[in-house]
Amino acid sequence: YKIGNENSFINLKKIQKINDKKRIHFSLLKKDYSFNSFLIGSIQIKNLLFAVLAAYLSGIKIDTILRNIGKIKPINGRLEQIGKLKNKSRVILDYAHTPDALKTVISNIKEDYPLSKISLVFGCGGDRDKSKRPLMGDIANKYCDKIYLTDDNPRFENPKVIRDQIKRKIKKKKY
């Protein structure tokens, strides 16, 4: 099962942004449907469409699916909006702990809020894959406007050493 072409069981046709919600237009077995969602990012919309397909193939009626799919909330810590500041900035939480996950999260936020600046608060855990630290710093440097490094459970490593490994790829003016 895949999303993206007319020959798929399910095909994402359009995502229409309306304030903080999205209207998701899709086809299932070549018939058009739509529903509303408050989830952030195309990755979560794709997951919703796969949930629609799984429910449908399990025998649940499409009307029942459409009535309920928009009620799905984000998983705690996965592209979860946890606040809004006075200046209308959004605070979005995600537990991205690999370079690929961090890049996916940032690109999904940029898709949804293309005119917004992105400030990132993150760190890397200690006693874990040290090679990912500069990679994550590089991703943050490329895709974020401001970076705030923090400690993320350094375990038995020196927190400053971890931060320095991340900072190697970050321009000074960004953090």
Segments and roles (model prediction):
Residues Q16-R23:
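A short, compositionally biased
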Residues K171-Y175:
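Short, intrinsically disordered, charge-balanced linker/junction segments flanking boundaries
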Residues N5, G125, D152-P154:
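Short, ordered loop/turn segments at secondary-structure junctions
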Residues N7, N19, K86, P154:
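Residue-level detector of flexible, active-site-proximal loop/helix-junction positions
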Residues L149-D164:
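Redox- and metal-dependent alpha/beta enzyme cores, enriched for Fe-S-associated oxidoreductases
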Residues Y1-E6, I15, I82, T150:
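Conserved beta-strand termini and adjacent loop/short-helix elements that scaffold enzyme active sites
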Residues I18, L28-K146, R168:
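Nucleotide phosphate-binding/pyrophosphate-handling subdomain across enzymes
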